[in-house]
Amino acid sequence: MAQQGQGSMDPAVLDDIIRRLLDYRNPKAGTKQAMLNDSEIRQLCFVSREIFLQQPCLLELAAPVKICGDIHGQYSDLLRLFEYGGFPPAANYLFLGDYVDRGKQSLETICLLLAYKIKYPENFFLLRGNHECASINRIYGFYDECKRRFNVKLWKVFTDTFNCLPVAAVIDEKILCMHGGLSPELINVEQIKNIERPTDVPDAGLLCDLLWSDPSKDVKGWGMNDRGVSYTFGADKVAEFLIKNDMDLVCRAHQVVEDGYEFFADRQLVTMFSAPNYCGEFDNAGALMSVDESLMCSFQILKPVDRRSRFF
C-alpha cells in the first residue's frame, strides 16, 4: 500500500496536532477546548480520507487488538479509554463508529482519531457508524458544533471524509465487527467488499443494515426495528450467519448497555458501548474489549464519573 497518508502530511505538524489535542488532559484554567485551526482540521480530513480509500471497505485485521464502541463526542472519556488501553502505538485499536453527535466535544474526538489514523495507518482503525452520515449528524449536534466553532463548510469536509470510512472488519477470519449488525442481504462476508466508496448511507439495504440493525431477544428471524430504520434480528440469525461464514463472534456497538458490554445469542454476539454516563442521562459504564493473539476476549470497564465534576 502506498503510504500516501503520512507522506502527504508533515510528521512534525501531525505530532504537534496530537500533542495539542492530548494537552487537554492538563488544561490551563478556563480552557475546555483543544483548539486546532480550520486548515489543520481540513488537512486531517483530506489525508485520512485518502488512507480510508486506499484500505478496503472490509478490513482484515490480526489480533491483538482493542475494540471500542460508541464515543459520541465524550472526549474526556476517549482520553480515559486510551489511559486504560494504552495510548497509540502501545496497542492496536479498532473503533466501531459513532464518534460525533450528542456529546460536547465531537470535534476534538474526531480530530484525535483521524490524527492517530494518519500517524499509525496499519495499527489504528476506524469503522463507520450511523452518525457518520450527514442526514443524522446534521440533527444530533455535530453540524451545530462545526457551525458554532468554525463554519458549515468544515462540516461538509467531514461529510466527505465520513463517506469514505470502512464499514466492517474481520479479525483473524473469526470475529466480524461492525457498528450496527447483520442484514438479510448479507449471506457471505465477502459481499461487504463490493460496497463502493465514497458513498452516503442509503435508507435501506446492506450498508444501511450494517450501520443500523439491532439484535433482539423478542424476535426469531428478522423483525421491525423501533428506530424506523433497518431490522432487528434474532439469535437464530446470528448462529446461522456464523456457521455459514465459519466465524465465532459478531462484535457491534450502536446500543447503550449498562455494563459497557453485553452478550447475546449464547455469547455469539457482543454489544460494545464506550461512552460512560451517556449524555449525562444514563448511568451506564463504558467498555474496552481486548482480543489477544489466541482470540480470547477480555473487558476493561470505565465506570461513569460524577456528572457534576466531569467537565471541570
Curated annotation (Swiss-Prot):
Instruction: Give the record's cofactor note, including how many are bound.
Output: Binds 2 manganese ions per subunit.
Q: Which residues does the entry assign to the active site, renumbered to this chain?
A: 131
Which cofactors, by name? Mn(2+)
Entries under PROSITE patterns matching the protein? SER_THR_PHOSPHATASE
Q: What is its EC number?
A: 3.1.3.16
What InterPro entries does UniProt report for this protein, alphabetically?
Answer: Calcineurin-like_PHP_ApaH, Metallo-depent_PP-like, PP1_catalytic_subunit, Ser/Thr-sp_prot-phosphatase, STPPase_N
Q: What molecular functions are annotated in GO for this chain?
A: metal ion binding; protein serine/threonine phosphatase activity
Binding of Mn(2+) 1, residues: 70, 72, 98
> Which enzyme class?
hydrolase
Locate the residues binding Mn(2+) 2.
Answer: 98, 130, 179, 254
- Residues annotated as carrying N-acetylalanine in the record are 2
Biological processes per GO annotation: cellular response to abscisic acid stimulus
Catalytic activity, reaction form: O-phospho-L-seryl-[protein] + H2O = L-seryl-[protein] + phosphate; O-phospho-L-threonyl-[protein] + H2O = L-threonyl-[protein] + phosphate
Where is this protein chiefly located?
nucleus
CDD domains xref list: MPP_PP1_PPKL
Q: Offer a single GO CC term for the protein.
A: nucleus
One Pfam family named in its UniProt record: STPPase_N
TM annotation in the entry: none
Subcellular location per UniProt equals: Nucleus; Cytoplasm
Q: Which UniProt keywords apply?
A: Acetylation, Cytoplasm, Hydrolase, Manganese, Metal-binding, Nucleus, Protein phosphatase
Question: Family assignment?
Answer: Belongs to the PPP phosphatase family. PP-1 subfamily.
**What this chain does, per the record?**
Serine/threonine-protein phosphatase that possesses phosphatase activity toward para-nitrophenyl phosphate (pNPP) in vitro.
Instruction: Identify this protein by name.
Output: Serine/threonine-protein phosphatase PP1 isozyme 5
Tell me the gene name: TOPP5
